[in-house]
């Protein structure tokens, strides 16, 4: 009985996998073309969560001018790496101006992000290169978005911003199109693979 269920699971996974293959490819290309932002609040208090957003704005403002004319994510990552001391200083100045004694630690890393919905687009779950900003003890809620392309501040210019940064029309469509179905397929495909390959006789 268990083997029969595994056969059914295999067939289901195969069919879903064929459908998902193109979406998986788009998702991988999308992750490779973005530099994400992850800001972690010191705590979940109202004050710490409010200043977290001020720090976010200070971080993005410190990078905006240099990122504006870049058209390649690798160049953006290199630029942000060189700017880390300035980013950290800007964030710490923001905290001090708001009357906080906490300090900020910034780093470039790779992190797992959940699926996130924004005003004009959505991003699939996965591992992304990211600028990580931790305030104080870093025990508060997170704020996730994108450093490059500057999508989180693009507003109505979202499509143009994505295009200038080198995202193809297909990938831009992945962000703003039928993303709920596409990302649902990705998540179910991952669950099916884990369930099948982790099962035993």
Q: Language-model segments: which ranges?
A:
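Alpha-helical transmembrane signal-anchor/signal-peptide segments
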Residues: 28-39
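Second-shell loop/turn segments in exported
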Residues: 38-46, 71-82, 134
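Short extracytoplasmic
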Residues: 38-69
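Mid-length scaffold segments of soluble, non-membrane domains
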Residues: 77-146
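Soluble extracytoplasmic domains of inner/organellar membrane proteins
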Residues: 120-179
